[in-house]
Amino acid sequence: VQQIARTVAAVLVAAMAGAVSTAYAQSDGIVDELKLGVLDHGVTFFEHSVETGVDLNGELLFHRLFEPLDVLGMSIIFRPNLGVSVATNGTTSIGYGGLSMDIMLVRNVFRDGDGFFLDGAFDLVVHDGCLNNCPSDRKALGSRLLGRRAGEIGYQIDPQWSVSAMIDHIGNYGLATPNAGLKTAGIRIGYKF
């Protein structure tokens, strides 16, 4: 099963590379944005972290599903996403896909084209981590298929480049036992095509 999860992750990375090269060659392609980041694996706030290390994260955000919503002067868009987080120390790596909600809080703060944003995502996850009866340095995630929630706050430097801080949580949300869950947090750079 771990080999299947690693194969799925490799296919996702290859698909991302292909989509990025296609999007770069054609500005009207299906890919809207690429985000790359470095994440702290196994973030905890009040307890000892079981899994630790550094994850490399890549995410494709596709063009919006419909016209932006304007709520209280903030622009809200919904975009499908597809991503991977690879644990560099051999612990739990994930592949995910779902829906991102992007909220542009304020535009043209310091210059034309910049602004501050909030993003949230809800995704399905496939992982290569431990399920049950795990060694002491691994999280027991209970199910091969998990859910993912992510939050991000960032600065749109110009119409193409952004920098952001992101945190996410994967877990089975009580649909299987055990349900240890896993958090990562870090910094990402975004590039819009």
Predicted features along the sequence, with ranges:
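Cleavable N-terminal export/targeting peptides
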Residues: 1-29
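Repeated loop/turn-to-beta-strand initiation elements of outer-membrane beta-barrel proteins
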Residues: 34, 65-70, 107-109, 116, ...
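Membrane-embedded beta-strand positions of outer-membrane beta-barrel proteins
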Residues: 34-38, 58, 80-84, 118-122, ...
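Sequence/structural signature of outer-membrane beta-barrel proteins
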Residues: 41-45, 65-67, 83-89, 106-108, ...
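Solvent-exposed loop/turn segments connecting transmembrane beta-strands
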Residues: 44-52, 84-95, 112, 174-182
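Outer-membrane beta-barrel "beta-signal"
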Residues: 54-58, 181-193
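Residue-level signature of outer-membrane beta-barrel architecture
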Residues: 60-64, 86, 101-103, 107, ...
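Outer-membrane beta-barrel translocator/channel fold
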Residues: 118-150, 154
